[in-house]
Amino acid sequence: INTVKKLKSIPLKYGTEIDVRSYNNKLILAHDPFKKGDNLNFYLKNYNHGTLIVNIKEAGIEYLVVKQLKKFKIKNYFLLDVEFPFIYKSSRKGFKNTSIRFSEEESIDTVKKYINRINWVWIDTFSKLPINKNNIKVLNKFKKCLVSPDRWNRPQDIKKYIKTMKQKNFSIDCVMTSKST
């Protein structure tokens, strides 16, 4: 949800994901480079919603983005898709509002290293729900955001995933879905 106009149509109980990059020395919302977009500050000024997922689209702007989040008193957020050097350095300085990725392609061993260092794990579902009894123990040390299989054109898997999570007593804190409500 990269525009204030679209944000205003989202019920306050829901969070959103935004794509942040720089353009003409300003932080803007745009998925693709070299495109104009809404000013990040204007968006944050209008943000009164649930969890804000801040997808960093350009290395080097992370601290500038965090500064703006603090300025607008946004507390319920995490950074997504930041480069690993940022995760490494910032987590060792006490910054926890970022996420580490986990999927069938991204190792639980890396996730383990960030227990008590960061708050969030982003659980992607490229081709399947990648949870089992062993990795659930690790994942439960974090707040969890699950990518809904509808993001990968598999809406038919949603009910199966819910059933599996219930059977494994696995709960999540938020879901990234294709739907806006």
Task: State the predicted function of each range.
Residues I1-T181:
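Phosphate-group recognition and catalysis centered on beta-loop-alpha active-site segments
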